[in-house]
Amino acid sequence: MTVTRFSVFVIALLLSLGYGSNASAKGKGYDPHIDPTNFQTKVDNPYLPLVPGTTYKYLEKEGRDTRENIVTVMPDTKVVMGITCTVVHDVVNEKGALKEDTFDWYAQDKEGNVWYFGEDTKEYKKNGVDTEGSWEAGVGPNQPGIIMPSHPTPGKPFRQEYGPGHAEDMGQVIALHETVTVPDGTFKDCVKTKEWSLLESGHENKWYAKDIGVVRTESTTKEVVTLISVTHQ
């Protein structure tokens, strides 16, 4: 049997991400090979396209509480680990007051995997501003992870981020071809994921629609997030 260069690359990538071992669960041995020449400037994965000028409006509900979540793909970029990342601005408002203000950094490799390289986040609380969730890949032990694989397939968990003690989110594709109805419409053939943090209890399920991205999120805390609208500049 002939093993192609592409096959060797894929095998190496999966092993570096912890597939087929317990490295992804414990963090030990997680050291993905990041080559800037293997990344492109656009993020055009069908299930997580990040087109500058696109704004997503979501409604968050948990019991009687509601919050507005506005996610905007910025024209700005940020270089992380030598890679030009797309900047996404994520704002959460509650009763007209700013609650969270975050800048996330994403990049896509040439195989189509969307990587998460960190965030600059501020959470506004009664006693001040909390920036504990901020982290950047390549700084100290922090490493990037994959948010959306190039070819989503139900299987083993993978790391979405790795900052020991403060950024340890995991992801797992659990279903394909899901149909989801939200205020923005009905979407077929959605990818369903399970996502959780190794630092906290509980998890959430997300549905990603083709050519859109996240359209619905359900958490074990009973929080439900639905897509209200998508606009393009």
Each language-model region and where it sits:
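Conserved functional acidic sites
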Residues: 26-233
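Bacterial N-terminal signal peptides that target proteins for export
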Residues: 1-9
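Bacterial N-terminal signal peptides
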Residues: 8-18
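Bacterial Sec-dependent signal peptides at the C-terminal "C-region" and cleavage site
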Residues: 17-26
